[in-house]
Amino acid sequence: MSWLIVGSVPRADFPLAQGDYRLQDDTLFLDGQRIRVARGTPALMAVAAAAAEVLAVPAPQALVAGDIGTGEGSRAVYAHLVENIAHIDHAGLTFHYLLPDIAWHNQVLWTLEARNPAPLLVADAGFMYAAKMSGYAAHYDLFTPDAGEIAFLADEVAPHPFYTRGFLLQEEDRVPELIERAYAEENAARHLLVKGKTDYVVAKGTTVAEITAPDVPAMEPIGGTGDSLTGLVTALLASGMEMTQSCRVAALANRHLGHFANPTPAFGVADLLPFLRRALERALE
């Protein structure tokens, strides 16, 4: 299935760019621009492209702009989506690091939902925050929060993870309770892939898989491993795999990625990419 990754690049000088991209070593090439793979949306894009190659499917396309926290690039992306919706004909979209803006979020969501058929919608990071804040979380097919972000989704009053109430930020063994609470408050997508010491795959409020192994503690301090998980599930969904199976395989592959790479905390996502084929093939067995 055709897929579009929507996010940002942490550079003030990066223009709005859209289209096919390719990965070469630790660099992405998109619309005449070069992007170094570190973390954030570039990490997601790199992993999705590498995984698509393993799956023998076309790599997703991307729509990104530079944003270092001012929101200027994010607003350019939002506006481009709304103004060009007739040309956004992908079967699925993965929304990533964009500055949360409820008004723009709602315009994007409504225009996409007006399509027939409506595309699959995946959200992580800043766009997931906007989806929750808008009250439209249940309109999404998949959120990919980490253990801290599931506490935010479970808090019906927090406008941002920074403001999640302390009584919800306890031990990670409370994640099942927080998942239940997020659904009760209608702050969860139809499916969740929660990354943590245990990875949870959830469908309409019911946990359908828990993944605990292989356990590679050195992966935790590496920036971008949540982005790699979202990149993996993006590629798997784009291959046509069913949602819960895509989530389970992505979680397994992300763990095998750490196992085969044997990383140190100094690693970045680019250092993990050479091990992705082996990790994904193992997860697919």
Role assignments for model-derived ranges:
Residues 255-285:
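Charged C-terminal helix
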Residues 175-185, 242-258, 276-277:
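Short, well-structured alpha-helical segments that form the helix of a local strand-helix-strand
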Residues 2-11, 40-141, 151, 169, ...:
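Ribokinase/PfkB-type carbohydrate-kinase core domain
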Residues 1-25:
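Positively charged, low-complexity intrinsically disordered leader regions
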Residues 31-36, 213-224:
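Short pre-catalytic strand/loop immediately N-terminal to key active-site residues, enriched for Gly-Thr
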Residues 130-208:
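Conserved phosphate/ATP/ADP-binding segment of small-molecule kinases
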Residues 18-45:
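Short catalytic helix/loop segments, enriched in acidic residues and glycine
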Residues 221-252:
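Short, small-residue alpha-helix embedded
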